[in-house]
């Protein structure tokens, strides 16, 4: 299609008004004059909710790349100091000069002077290395505080998919096994250790394999039935190791973090694919695009065995081992929101791109989604009149917006697999809720440190707080009980937590004793709570740097408890 020039068209019309204009030219002119086509004014209103999931993903991708970069930069960083340092080049030059001096064997250069010079250079290098290690240790500690989750410092890890695969495995496995071709599974996992797999996945595959094997044995020789069923079960269980059953395209984190042993039957193919960067990228691209699997026979037979191995490189293992705390995302978002206008102005000044933070959309019509022919007819009828891409939205469901033509199958896949969408939206909702808990955790630790350094609040301040304290604002994040126990523990968080637990136990015991008649369950709960209270009181006497170990000894046919303490590794 030739490039459309409206100035040239206008000039031709003015020079020769009788000239006919082609339909193609009129169509292009229509698109230029009305790029966002509006069809008819309808009184109906569609209510929509929009969540920018792509922005959330990009932020996490940037965070991942940023963490990988700063830790890698720390490994390669060599600090510079005010005094001159011996680089490799200057050190070699000085040593060569000393060697030449020794060869001359003149009386002008005493051997003691040469030795002292060498020792001086060695001491300088040793001092520089020690300072470098100390500086790197300090920076590494700082980076880990902000970018590596620590349950003692942070409220929650940014990684929340740990339990997803386990919880959905049992439900999904039955449908996976039911549609699996037995012959394919048997050949794919022929080298799987059947005994290990059977022991590991017996509870998961028992009911599934029982029904599958029953139908298989009906038309199979009895002697071969057992072998077929065992190999089928082994194949199904082996495949679930490498993929998240709820989201098959995602490589589970535990696979990404560990070094995988390449099976012997795959070693030759893996070596050939990873021999060059071009081959590796091509294979990775094919694995990420299902429609290309037919080009690679071996990958098509068992793609889940190839994909985690190819993507399980030193870089991905390194990145997956540095999981940031959710606190960092919260602080980062708070920084962006608090300095948004300044960041926007600076970004527009530095880069040529313009911000794309607001969205405008139009609803053209409503078509019965059950009639796919009507949906297609609408698209192909108006696609040439509309300058922008057309997206179809399923009413009453969350819908991912994308190109109708180019990415239709891709978006239909996500729209139909609601578990993937649910996981994303649940995470988005969880991110909105976690801010208060992170702020509360930060205030709790800072208040504990303040009590350790300056002591408890003055009595007058406590009276004022008890009079004017409300549940709104920062003060409302910590309860009076928590503040009281922090002061009682002199800022020791471990003891303060024990005091909180003791208060809860005493309150529960008080409620149970206030009842006239206790049920058997309530009596058991009362006994259990009293034991927990006694244990908590004993734990108050355990020093912070020790671990308590309860030992039971036989004393004249009577068991008695002895308490031992061992040094804790801090």
Swiss-Prot record:
Q: Where does this one sit in the cell?
A: Host cytoplasm
The recorded induction information for this protein reads:
Expressed in the late phase of the viral replicative cycle.
Could you say which residues form the signal peptide?
A: none
Write out the ranges of the repeats annotated as sequence: 161-164, 165-168, 169-172, 173-176, 177-180, 181-184, 185-188, 189-192, 193-196, 197-200, 201-204, 205-208, 209-212, 213-216, 217-220, 221-224, 225-228, 229-232, 233-236, 237-240
Main localisation:
host cell
Cellular component, GO annotation: host cell cytoplasm
Region (20 X 4 AA tandem repeats of [CNS]-[ATV]-[DNS]-T) residue ranges read 161-240
> Record's family?
Belongs to the asfivirus B602L family.
From the Swiss-Prot or TrEMBL record, give the protein name: Protein B602L
Q: Where does this protein come from, organism-wise?
A: African swine fever virus (isolate Tick/South Africa/Pretoriuskop Pr4/1996) (ASFV)
